[in-house]
Amino acid sequence: LIPLGVLFLLLSMQRASEAHHEILFRTYVQISLVVLPALYALFLINLLKMSSLIKLMQITLFCTILIYFMEPGHGLLDFVNPSNWAKISIIHSNSFTESDICSEAFFNLFAFFNFYKNARGEEINLKNARVCYRISLIFTILCFKRLAMLFVICIVILDKVIDWRGQISKYLVPLMSILFTAATVLYTEFMKGDLFPGFDVYNFTTGRDYILSLWKRIDYISYGYGSSMILIGRYLEMDLVQIYMELNILALFAFAFVFFKIAGTNVYSVITMTYAFLNMLTASSLPGSLSWVIAFITIASVSSDKCAREQIYISEQKSRMKKMFSKKKGGKRIVQTSVSYHST
C-alpha cells in the first residue's frame, strides 16, 4: 500500500501544479486514510495470536455497541415507541435505528465473527465467539444500511452452501479492478445526470448527486486527492468517484488492483472486499478507519496461514448442500488456512 500512497501523492502534486495551487494538507490526511488502516492491521496480525485478535474484536464489538446507544435517537424510549417502528421504510432507507457512525464497524465485525464462530483452538472460547456473531448480525441489521443488510442475508444463506476456504482464480484481481474502474466511470456519469436523463437521481442516491453538484459549480477543479472537501466545504461521500475525479482513472485502477491483490484468491476475502468496493462506489467508508482495520484483519487472517500455524481449526456447519461443494477429510469436515497474505 505504500507505493499506492506514493502514487496518489505524485498525482496530487501534478493536479495541484496544473491548477497553479499548492498541495493541500487535506491530501496527506486523505492518503493516510488509505494507507494506515492496512499497515495497522498487518501490525496487529503479526503481533497478536489469533485468540488475542478474537478477544480484541469482542472488546471492539462491546465498545461499538456503547457508541451506538450514545447516538441521538437510540435511547430506550425510542426503541419502545411503536410509532418509530411504524415509520421504518426499506425503500426510502428510513429508520430510527439507522447509524452512519457504527454501521461499517458492525458489518465488518459480523464478517469477522461469521468466519470464526466455529473456530477451535487453544484459548479460544467458542461460545463467546458465537454470541458475538449473533450480536453483530443483529446490530448490522439495526444500522439499516441496505447494502450491508443485503450482504448479511447473502452471507448467512451462502454459509450453508459455500466453503469459505475455497479458492478463486488469480485472474479475478485484474478482472475486479477493471470492473470497478468501469463501474465508477459509469456511476460518475449517472450521478452527473448524463447517463439517464429524467431519472430521479436525488432520491436514488439519497442526495449524493447534490453534493457532487456543489463541485460542478466550480467546474470540478482539483488540487489533488481530498481537495474537493476543502473546495465544497463537505465530504463528497463517494470514495471511488472521488479518486477518479480528483486524480485520474489510472489512480482508480491502481487502488482497486492493490486492494483486491490484498484480498488474494480466498472466497471469503474476495466477498468481503467486494462489499467494501460496492460501498465505496455508492457511499463512503474510507474515513471510517476502525471499520477498515477490522476488515483488513479479517481478510489477512482468513487468507493467510496464521490459523494453521497456531493450530486453530474452523469446523464448518454441516449441510447437505455444502457436501456437494466441499471435500471430506478423514470423515471429519475440518478446513485449514493455506493461502499466503499478499502485502503490497
In which residue ranges do the predicted regions lie?
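Residue-identity detector for glycine
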Residues: G330-G331
